């Protein structure tokens, strides 16, 4: 065939292929118009954290025996434990305990291996500050319990879509005597 005719045929095929791809993209876009939005309006709506969420670490000063297991299992040797040995009771006395959340990777090893369970993970994830030195929490700041977002009337809590689907399936699968 003539080269000009062949060029027009390939141009026509390319045009048809491009139109098909644009049409498929448009159909995909239109199929998403009826769905609920995935994103949330963050400061006013907060999602409920999962059950084993690893947030800020809570510390109980009275339970700590200053064994420093948390420092040894931490991949970055993060917790700073200051103690002194009391000769009369032959035991370590904890003086200061601090964690720098600007460096912490929230792995949870310190919580997992603590023999007295004085460390626990909370659901608090809002740790942002303007000064990174404010992220260095001492034992007083670590012992503060997080504020529950469930009781705050100014914040609307939103369940994860996977949690709501599981709860819907459980409710639909449960049968009562009258549901035969």
Swiss-Prot record:
Its main location: plastid. Its EC number is 7.1.1.-. [4Fe-4S] cluster 2 binds at residues 74, 104, 107, 110. It catalyses: a plastoquinone + NADH + (n+1) H(+)(in) = a plastoquinol + NAD(+) + n H(+)(out); a plastoquinone + NADPH + (n+1) H(+)(in) = a plastoquinol + NADP(+) + n H(+)(out). Its cofactor is [4Fe-4S] cluster. The keyword 4Fe-4S applies. GO terms for biological process: photosynthesis, light reaction. Binds 2 [4Fe-4S] clusters per subunit. It holds the Pfam family Fer4_7. GO terms for molecular function: 4 iron, 4 sulfur cluster binding; iron ion binding; NADH dehydrogenase (ubiquinone) activity; quinone binding. Keywords: 4Fe-4S, Chloroplast, Iron, Iron-sulfur, Membrane, Metal-binding, NAD, NADP, Plastid, Plastoquinone, Quinone, Repeat, Thylakoid, Translocase. It is a peripheral membrane protein. Belongs to the complex I 23 kDa subunit family. NCBIfam families: ndhI, NuoI, PRK05888.1-3. NDH is composed of at least 16 different subunits, 5 of which are encoded in the nucleus. This is NAD(P)H-quinone oxidoreductase subunit I, chloroplastic.
